[in-house]
Amino acid sequence: MAEISAALVKELREKTGAGMMDCKKALTETSGDMEAAVDWLRKKGLAAAAKKSGRVAAEGLVGVVAAPTAGACVEVNAETDFVARNETFQNFVAKVTELALTTGDDVEKLQSQPFPGTGRTVAEELTHLVATIGENMTIRRAARLSVTQGIVSTYMHSSLVPNLGKIGVLVALESAGDQAKLQELGKQIAMHIAAARPEALDIADVDPSKLNRERDVLADQARASGKPEEIVQKMVEGRVRKYYEEVVLLEQVFVVDGETKIRKVVENAGKTVGAPVKLTGFVRFALGEGIEKATSDFAAEVASMAG
């Protein structure tokens, strides 16, 4: 069996908040498998829901841009946060994000595009930038949303300059309604997404393997109560509904008012904008996704900004 190092125990503690000895026992019982150890702790009631954290230690910038019926979001990483304040780096991220309006989520295709005004490709310009600034940099990911009729709204939380910052969000709303009112709705939903961190648009979009894993953990937790199996299954279904409310955007409670589900917010908006509204997609890129950042109350902060 692999030796359980202090670093592994520390990582598990940071992910779960469980005690040091419990973390060591969990890792011992699971032969050092981090994911299995998280589940072991949860089944024993010693940890909160698993958090994907700590594995990516990236700085840099996230960029967003919107066209009339499309939007793009890109994350470009560097080694230190100092680079994010470099005007040349900011200009690079902004231009690359605009190019992603055409290339979408294909980073390889994005890197092969001509970089405006240089005679170089994006990849070549990035190499040039690395040599100039002296830090390693990578285009980590890109995404694009579009609508046939309606708008794609953007939101940037913790922006250093317009459309560049630490958390970028896109929201696609299909509707023939009033564009200005749609933009207002889109902005508020985008701010909600920044705070609430949904993982899927609708229940049907939830990763089946992740859902099955969650069910297994919830079932073991419920059985620990000693109740009959049919009661256990009802408890599990209730907890699965709660899980959906945590990770599915349309099932989440709107952080702006604290009571209405996003599904209902979108449905009600049809009356305001003058035509039915459908939320067809979203993107949320957080810089160095998974790193736990100290913040007083992010959801409350976004809600106050939106209100």
UniProtKB/Swiss-Prot annotation:
One of its GO terms (cellular component) is cytoplasm. Associates with the EF-Tu.GDP complex and induces the exchange of GDP to GTP. It remains bound to the aminoacyl-tRNA.EF-Tu.GTP complex up to the GTP hydrolysis stage on the ribosome. GO terms for molecular function: translation elongation factor activity. It is found in: Cytoplasm. This is Elongation factor Ts. It comes from the Bacteria. Keywords: Cytoplasm, Elongation factor, Protein biosynthesis. Belongs to the EF-Ts family. CDD domains: UBA_EF-Ts. Residues 80-83 are annotated as: Involved in Mg(2+) ion dislocation from EF-Tu.
